[in-house]
Amino acid sequence: MNTFALKGTFLDTPAPDTLRVREGYLLCENGLCAGFSETAPAGVEVLDYTGKIITPGLVDLHLHAPQYSYCGTAMDLELLDWLQQYTYPEEAHYADPAYARLGYSYFVRDLKNSATTRACIFATLHTDATLELMHQLRGAGLSAFVGKLGMDRNSPDSYREPSAAAGLAETRRWLDTCRAGKMLSGWTGDRDN
């Protein structure tokens, strides 16, 4: 059993419109929060963060990693215009492994340095770039669900898969590679479910 306690100033919101600030110890057992105490638990290693604020991590349920480089831009455009002018041209660059590696390195670095501890992340339709993102997230110690996109219509030729069958084949290749690399927790290997 991996047990330790964090000592510090804890902030949380136990109810809407309620901010709680407490000094004390958070007992952690096997990666789970097991309890809070104002006194140090006996016989447990204490990691002392006195003077530091400790908060619950945030979960981002909808992130597009390849869009990170231009987030907050062109807010005057409607969605479809924004996709055509910004998103599709940028995401097409992720076919280049070196471009994907560099672009995702900025995204992963900044995500790691944020309060986000878990995320659901969209990559691109490029299998190898999607695997690169997953590799970087794992290397940074971040936990995420990552999705490979599939597109065979309603986007420019530079950013679409040649056909639905080709997209399915690439998605299977992505899943098989993830499974072989043990990147899918709980994956059963049943392609029909």
Which functions belong to the PLM regions below?
Residues K7-G8, T127-D128, R153-N154:
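Short secondary-structure capping/turn micro-motifs that flank functional sites
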